[in-house]
Amino acid sequence: MLFKTIFYQKLQKKVTTLFNLETERVIREIENLNKNNPKVIFQAPEGLKLKVEKEIEKIKQYFKQKNINIEIYLWGNTCFGACDLIDNHVKNLNVDLIIHYGHEKLSYANPEIKTLFIPAYHIFNKDEEEKILNDIKNFIEKHKSGGKKVAIATTIQYKKLLKDFNPSIILGCRGEVKEGDVILFVGTGRFHPLMIAYKYQKEVFIYNPLSKCFDKISEEEINKFIKKRILAISKLLLNKPKKVGVVLSTKKGQCRKRVFDEIIKLLEENDVNYLPILVDNISPDILFYDVDCYIIVACPRIVLDDYILYKKPIYTPEEFKLFLKNSFKYKFDEIKEDDF
């Protein structure tokens, strides 16, 4: 135990000041395998890959000093979220453990190989924490004085910091927010708050805990986006597609088989020819088929964020249903537990 304590004290001096990668927990999980020469794969999103690379070196050093053999690999492909599990990709390697950084386990995506999820909580010093929490409290009080309730949303990295505000945890593909008159998203970037804005079709305030600045996604921006998507749907009404590509992601947390089957049934009922396509990573360069458009049965953000990159029109399942119903009442598509 003394050796382990001294080792962790040394690690703490070197470890990143931005994210808590829970080195001790990872080492303990590997040791608990109680296996000679265990195989462990580390998986992380792009923003954490270089930090995890350094983390691997520290963990290798620990086991080397204990004279324990271990095989460690870094997953080099994508990691879009807890939906993007790799157990099916690596099962032929007889892997004992996967360390997945940056996300929490999804109830509808269960890995078949033992997987440890490390949230990678953001680390702030005391002054930074105080500044962040006071800024949020002042925002809440300001709107409370006007008779409005503020709902706080954030990503997993700030869950621990904001625990006293009981925040909703937002995923890229889902935007469930507790009831409130005003929504404040705490986090970096616009990817996650856009999800909330699209779903609730109302402005979302943003507080960036790194820059300590406020921003917002306006109703004007949301309405502009919805108009673009309705225009895309209306083009289907003007030129009814003769053949449609129906793309189903094979990623465990995006493989919405029930939705896929529902779309196929609707196409058959409406006498529309279709080509079912199975894909892991959906991107513009692999959708080159002789179809008029594609229905993307996967993460809805592929359509909502990247539609302009595709040569042929792409639609979410909900958008294509609007076309079949001849409706212009836009309905946002998001992944739900009963999609699988």
UniProtKB/Swiss-Prot annotation:
Pfam families: Diphthamide_syn. It catalyses: L-histidyl-[translation elongation factor 2] + S-adenosyl-L-methionine = 2-[(3S)-amino-3-carboxypropyl]-L-histidyl-[translation elongation factor 2] + S-methyl-5'-thioadenosine + H(+). One of its GO terms (biological process) is protein histidyl modification to diphthamide. GO terms for molecular function: 2-(3-amino-3-carboxypropyl)histidine synthase activity; 4 iron, 4 sulfur cluster binding; metal ion binding. Its cofactor is [4Fe-4S] cluster. Keywords: 4Fe-4S, Iron, Iron-sulfur, Metal-binding, S-adenosyl-L-methionine, Transferase. [4Fe-4S] cluster binds at residues 83, 173, 299. Unlike the enzymes in the radical SAM superfamily, Dph2 does not form the canonical 5'-deoxyadenosyl radical. Instead, it breaks the C(gamma)-S bond of SAM and generates a 3-amino-3-carboxypropyl radical intermediate. Homodimer. This is 2-(3-amino-3-carboxypropyl)histidine synthase. It comes from Methanocaldococcus jannaschii (strain ATCC 43067 / DSM 2661 / JAL-1 / JCM 10045 / NBRC 100440) (Methanococcus jannaschii).
